[in-house]
From Swiss-Prot:
Keywords tagged on the record: Hydrolase, Manganese
Keyword Hydrolase: yes
The name this protein goes by in its record: Adenine deaminase
PANTHER family: ADENINE DEAMINASE, N-ACETYLGLUCOSAMINE-6-PHOSPHATE DEACETYLASE
Matches recorded under Pfam families: Adenine_deam_C, Amidohydro_1
GO molecular function annotation: adenine deaminase activity
CDD domains tied to this protein: AdeC
Gene: ade
EC numbers on record: 3.5.4.2
Enzyme class: hydrolase
UniProt family annotation: Belongs to the metallo-dependent hydrolases superfamily. Adenine deaminase family.
Length: 571
């Protein structure tokens, strides 16, 4: 180690050869927001210096191209890509992502610590720095049934692992406000670490209380005033632009000369199709520039700001002693990525990675569908013609509205009304064969016939389905059992399309291109059935998440998120 350090210093002083010298670069300096013409010397995976270096074992003339730090995705759930970790890395590295911070509460809610071990092990040899925020909400709440539990003792143990930066998003904000001991125990276990927040709509004294617990970020702002208040109270605002959650346009005015150091770009949840077509965090940077943000500032929000918040020493800048994670592009406004370096090695060029992804999935993660046998009649909503809560989807958002509508009944059973876009929604517990089935109605999917179903249902990932009739819903759920998890579409009792996701019912074992093609086909078929949503399965996956207002459905029933309680229903 001392030998390497001594040699690094010699290279920095110009007394020894660098491993790599990049000539004639226009270096994006994230410290002073300037573009600096310079050469860059790299040794041992680190940047030795920025200046007039020419002596190197390898010399590459960039001919005036821009050189910027590798991008850092400040908050994401890699499982939302539906890709095996090696394929996920293949998708994002080509788009300039050099590091990311992930909260693995998706796979953890199904498989517990074994899921975390799989991701960390599978990513160990990839040219991508993956940092973990220990999942704080496994299970997310008491209002649903998860497949595992991570308690405060587990949090303490996991925080000792390498590349663990802190405690993941505290979604159970009511648990914080009400002082639930198990919630506070996890917060105390992570004292001194980075604590991520999840506080949709919190303001005033409740916001003060939440922040006072030591939680200093939030990625759930959807209104500018909300973001301004949270920033003023000391929070870092993670400006999110994902597949279903698109908040960049609304929140970008928050970024000013006075506030930008407290702002970070994130994607939260991004589908593999969006990763392939538009990119990862680079897509957020690109869109921000198109919306008028200065390119260098946009890069700061996806590099140094993120690194400093998460205390990632050596990440996020092109400067002496920093990791040589770098991007080469010709046009900063377009962020057209030519080359990606990781620790000084060229790992992607012209959109193609230069390494071979290898998948290693434990067999124990390939069998996670444990639904108690049920009949079509078990899906019925019993009741008389009366007012009942109905979930309304808001396009482009994961928050929902609660409607109270009079629903017709036939023979003591409440029925969907396709003409009014009132469809059946069900959630079936899939972890321990409890037989729990949540039933409700939802508005906004637009299906005129058939049903869609998914074993991806944040955050406990039970099976969720929406359809025009119980028979098609039943068939779709049975298809998910057959393929060991995934998504399915059924029309007139026949399986029209399905995408297997056998790894915990969340991830595919297929290459990126095959998964994207399959998803595009099933989404196209959903549109053909009248679905109004651009990402129907991504939207469906959030309808069971009882920590996002206003109304949700879990395997235990309808949840009033604002009151944080189940809504009584007839049985």
């Amino acid at each position: 180690m001392q030998t390497n350090l001594s040699q690094l210093i010699k290279v920095a002083r110009g007394e020894a050869k660098a491993d790599l010298v990049l000539l004639n670069a226009r270096v994006v300096n994230v410290f002073n927001a300037e573009i600096e013409p310079a050469n860059v010397a790299v040794f041992g995976g680190q940047i030795a210096g920025v200046g007039d270096y020419t002596l190197g074992n390898r010399v590459l003339d960039l001919k005036g191209a821009y050189l910027l730090p590798g991008l850092i995705n400040g908050h994401t759930h890699v499982e939302s890509s539906m890709l095996d970790i090696s394929q996920y890395a293949r998708a994002v590295i080509a788009h300039g992502t050099s590091a990311l911070i992930t909260d693995l509460h998706e796979i953890s809610n199904v498989c517990g610590k074994e899921g975390i071990d799989y991701v960390l092990s599978a990513s160990a040899d990839l040219p991508l720095n993956i940092f973990l925020q220990v999942p704080s909400c496994v299970p997310a709440t008491h209002l649903e049934t998860a497949g595992a539990e991570i308690n405060s003792n587990d949090v303490t143990e996991l925080l000792r692992l390498p590349n663990v930066t802190g405690l993941g998003e505290m979604m159970n904000f009511p648990g914080v406000l009400f002082g639930i001991p198990s919630v506070l125990d996890k917060i105390e276990a992570a004292s001194g670490k980075v604590l991520d927040g999840h506080a949709p709509g919190l303001s005033g004294k409740d916001l003060n209380a939440y922040i006072s617990a030591g939680i200093h970020s939030d990625h759930e702002c959807i209104q500018l005033d909300e973001a301004k208040e949270k920033l003023a109270r000391g929070m870092y605002i993670m400006i999110r632009e994902g597949s279903s959650e698109k908040n960049l346009t609304e929140l970008l005015p928050l970024v000013t000369d006075k506030t930008y150091k407290r702002c970070i770009f994130v994607v939260d949840d991004r589908s593999c199709a969006d990763l392939q077509r538009d990119g990862d965090i680079d897509a957020v940077v690109r869109k921000a520039i198109k919306l008028g943000l200065d390119p260098v500032r946009a890069i700061q929000l996806a590099s140094i700001n993120t690194a400093e918040y998460f205390r990632l020493n050596g990440h996020g800048a092109i400067a002496p002693g920093y990791l040589a994670n770098m991007i080469v592009c010709q046009d900063l406004n377009q962020l057209d990525i030519d080359m990606v370096f990781h620790k000084g090695e060229l790992v992607a060029e012209k959109g193609q990675v230069l390494f071979k992804p290898q998948s290693h999935v434990p067999k124990s993660l390939l069998s996670s569908m444990h639904i108690k046998p049920f009949d079509i009649k078990d899906l019925a909503i019993k009741g008389s013609s009366t007012q009942m809560p109905v979930i309304e989807v808001i396009p482009g958002q994961i928050v929902t509205r609660r409607l109270n509508l009079k629903i017709p009944a036939e023979n003591g059973v409440l029925t969907p009304d396709i003409e009014q876009d009132l469809l059946k929604i069900v959630v079936l517990e899939r972890h321990c064969q409890s037989g729990n089935i949540g039933r409700g109605l939802i508005k906004g999917f637009g299906l005129k016939k058939g049903a869609i179903a998914s074993s991806v249902a944040h955050d406990s990932h039970n099976v969720i389905a929406v359809g025009t009739n119980d028979a098609d819903i039943y068939t779709a759920v049975k298809e998910l059992e057959r393929i060991n998890g995934g998504i399915a579409l059924v029309v007139d009792g026949k399986i029209s399309a399905s995408v297997p996701l056998p790894v915990a019912g969340l991830l595919s074992t297929q290459p990126l291109e095959k998964v994207v093609d399959a998803l595009e086909e099933i989404n196209k078929q959903a549109a053909g059935l009248g679905c109004k949503l651009s990402a129907p399965f991504a939207t469906l996956s959030f309808m069971a998440l009882p920590v996002i207002p206003e109304l949700r459905l879990t395997d235990l029933g309808l949840v009033d998120v604002n009151a944080f309680k189940l809504i009584p229903q007839e049985t």
